[in-house]
Every structure is written in C-alpha cells, then in structure tokens.
Amino acid sequence: MYENTTVGVVVPAHNEAAHIGEVIESIPSFVDRCYVVDDCSTDGTWAEIIAQVEPNVPRPVVTADGGVDRDLPDGPVSEGATPAADGPAADAGEVDTARSSTGDGVGLSASPGPDGEYEDTVVPVRHRVNRGRGGAIKTGYQLAFVEGMDVVAVMDGDGQMDPDILDRIIDPVVAGDADYAKGNRLVDADHWAAMSRWRLFGNAVLTLLTKVASGYWRMRDPQNGYTAVSAETLADVGVDHLYEDYGFLNDVLVRLRAHGKRVVDVPMTAVYEDEESGIQYRSFVPKLSALLLWGFLWRLWATYGLGDLDTDSVRAAD
C-alpha cells in the first residue's frame, strides 16, 4: 500500500525470458498486486515467471484465451471470491483458474488481510493466444479492477522502465492531481540522449498525430508505456473497448480526452540497454495514423454528439 492507496502493477510480457525475472524481482514493496501477463510467449517467459513465484507459497495461475471473463462485475468482488473463475467464459472453457483456497488450489484474495496487505503479490497470467501488448494490459486492468486496486500502473516486462521511479509515476494519481499519469522521455536532451534519431523522428510524428486526435496539446511522448491510472478512470473509459495492438496507448489518450480526464506527464530518462523496440515505424506509423483519424472523429462525435459526456470537463482539461 502507498499513501493509504492500494496499488496494482500490470507487467505485460511477450518473449521476455531474458528480462522478466529481474523485472518481477524489482517490483517495489509498496505494490499490493503485480499482474504478470504472458501474452502467449514462445520462449521461456512463462517458465521464468513461474520460477519467481514457486519458491514461495502456491499462487493463483490464470490462463486466458481472449482475455478474462468479459462479464466481470462492475466493482470489487467479495472477500474469498475468485475473479474470472465463474461466468460464461469459464463455462465455455475459455478461462481456467484456481477455484478456491482449498482443494483445487489457491484462489485470488480479493480483499487484504488484517494487516492491510494482500497475501500474495505476484499473480501469474497467461494468454493462450497472442492478443498484443494492449490485450495483455487489458487483462491486467480487468483483474486489478475486480480486486479493488485504487491505482493501476503498467511496467513493461522488457526491463526498460526503472522501478525506482514508480512512486513518481503514481504520485499524481494518488494525490488526486491527475486521472492518468505517463512517463515523458522528451523533456530535455539528457532524458532522450539514449534514443536513436529514427526512434526520435518516429516518436515526434506520433506525438503530433496523437495531439491532434486526443486534444491533449501539451502532452508529449505518447508511446511511453510507463503509466498509472485510477480505478474510477478505468471504469469511466471502459477497458473492454480499448484497442489491443501497439496503438493501445494512443487509443487510451483519445478516450481519456473524450471523458474529460486529466493527464500528467512525468519526466523520466530513456533506458534501452540491449532491448530493441518491437515497433516497425515504416508500417506502424501509417497503421496508427488510420487509427488516430478514426479516434479523432470518434472523439468529436462522443464529445459533441452525445448528451452523456461532460463536455465542460473536457474543455477544462486543456
């Protein structure tokens, strides 16, 4: 727990066997739940995840084909319940999970114990089919929301996000100064010195396109996936409707703007080490441009064409 706030961290991972173990080990102690989502990796990622949790106590393992149960409840489940263990998806064989704390395994502890802490921190999750980075994050978001996390951060499984600054990422949301906080590597030359010119150029193009589509004109570095969001914001935006591929981050910003949410950039230094970006900008930029054009038109329609969105708060978000 951090400042009387429960904190969940989603760690999406695809073929990150070389890094995922260190990422899990580095999760700060104030984190209540860490949802490590293996998005159908073909290397040893899953084995590395399990190796991190098996030496301790038995922990719940959720395997999801197409995500967790789509009929999740609207709020936290009662103590002792197991999110995604019941419902149509489970009945159809799409979701397998430990059902209870006795017999079939250890169920998810949906409520903290007497000391205010959750029994287990790491929750291993595995997709049976690859859904993309956004799909992995959505699965983590859904579980965190069901378990009643107040703030949910995202820390990639490639080791490029410094766990020592997680408190800085979540601070604006915890303090109530923002609904969504994200890292920004483009504040000054010292922060983006590690970025290649090609990566900088691609980021600049995507930043401009995302500003136009979202209306967040002071926002920079939209491809930065080091983020934090409040549970209330997740409920308002609607996790199920989010894009699941690499354009996930941009789609989130468009939807946040349509709902009048406050977004804050948190300065951070770029860290790459030996990891190469999975984004191929030659194909990604045109594809994302089409997505952002649709997002721009949708935002205008949602903001000014519907009566159930607070347009005053949207304008105040500038």
Ranges and model annotations:
Residues 1-2, 243, 250-318:
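Hydrophobic helical membrane-anchoring modules
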Residues 23-34, 52-56:
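Short, acidic, metal-binding catalytic loop of nucleotide-sugar glycosyltransferases
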Residues 32-41, 125:
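Short beta-strand/loop segment that forms part of the nucleotide-sugar
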Residues 38-49, 159:
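A conserved acidic beta->alpha catalytic loop
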Residues 149-160:
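Short beta-strand-to-loop acidic/aromatic patch adjacent to the donor-nucleotide binding site
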Residues 66-147, 163-246, 273-283:
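Acceptor/aglycone-binding surface of glycosyltransferases and processive sugar-polymer synthases
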Residues 1-26:
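N-proximal low-complexity "stem/linker" segments adjacent to membrane-targeting elements
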Residues 154, 181-184, 266-268:
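Short glycine/serine/threonine-enriched helix-capping/active-site loop
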